[in-house]
Amino acid sequence: DIVSDENEADIVVVNSCTVTNSADSGARSYINGIKKRGARVILTGCGAVSKGKELFNKNSVFGVIGASKKEDINALLKSQDPFFELGNLKSIDKNIVTNYENHTKAFIKIQEGCDFACSYCIIPAVRGKARSMDEEAILREAKILAYNGYNELVLTGTNIGSYGKDTGSSLGRLLGRLGKIGGIKRIRLGSIEPSQIDESFREILKESWLERHLHIALQHTSEAMLRIMRRRNQAFRDLELFLELSEIGFALGTDYIVGHPGESEEIWSEALENFKKFPLTHLHCFAYSPRTGTHSADMKVDVSGDVAKARLKILKQIVAENNFKFRQEHAKKGGSLNVLVEQLNGEFYEGFDQFYNKVKIKTDKQILKEWAVIDKFEVKSEGDYAQI
């Protein structure tokens, strides 16, 4: 039986992240805590590849399951003997998910792995080369999910913009086909790279079912820093792309790393001036921390933690102001918000609009899991509010 309280569980499956050293140490501490109360620990996720053998040999975990072996999880959980089933990094997930318990939207995994070689990232080593799921299988899954009432889909993967490179297709082509499925009102995307927005992707930018928010990973806005990071993008081309997308109404988010080795005051100043030119409305920004096994981890850390935090704060403030202005301008133009209501939090229903901004709604109606089209709303710095 599955229990909601892990303290009641005899077996706990830990789906681990390994993107940073702190993620590894956090997983290890969590595992030790579970073991102390006598439960069996099964390790899966990226940490199974990076730390699975070490933890298994130390008897810290009862079993290890790699991504390619997750179809065998039911049988493995019944095993009375310790097991190490890592599988391989070339497999393609063939599972079709038809239901997401307690979710208003559905997630479809379209690819696995990454062919990039960014200097700070361990993910290609633990997830393997980029490989695409079968396009017809993705479409079948989407049709079933739409039939089951999920009319917002979120496409996920390690590097979804690489979809189709190994099969002669593309993310744009896949999106075009998904958008024709009856019942689908909105398609959201995980993170994509600037270089992955090709002509086939541009062809679907004006489709009504495509979210009006794109998350495009810049990582930095200094040309010199991008070279140090072994990135494929160039700041000046990125700016052209972002301005183009902003002009046609997209809210734009990005990932950004501050404090990477080599981020001198001169490079930071250049990056900051460039950053201010980008019409960013959302930001996932973090201070660099060395990841064992990466090229960057062998470089001298020459930016202090305090300096990195200060730079982080500056970028967050810029984007927060941009986001506020973006929402104000949308309201002034008489624009409406299309919100899928996801939860009731106190007196407010909450959901995200087409620009991936949270909206709080007060109403006497039962609107959970419903779509709300909001024409009148109040824009505040912390979010948008409406009463219907």
Language model: regions and residue ranges:
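Proteins enriched for Cys/Gly/acidic motifs involved in redox and nucleic-acid/cofactor modification
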Residues: 1-162, 200, 214, 235-244, ...
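Conserved beta-strand core positions
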Residues: 11-12, 106, 153, 187, ...
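Short, glycine- and charge-enriched coil/turn segments that flank and shape catalytic ligand pockets
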Residues: 37-38, 78-84, 165-173, 247, ...
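Hydrophobic alpha-helical scaffolding
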Residues: 128-131, 190-191, 231, 261, ...
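Hydrophobic, well-ordered secondary-structure elements that form the walls
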Residues: 216, 255, 275, 283, ...
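Conserved loop-to-beta-strand segment in the C-terminal subdomain of adenylate-forming
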Residues: 291-297
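Terminal RNA-binding accessory module
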Residues: 298-388
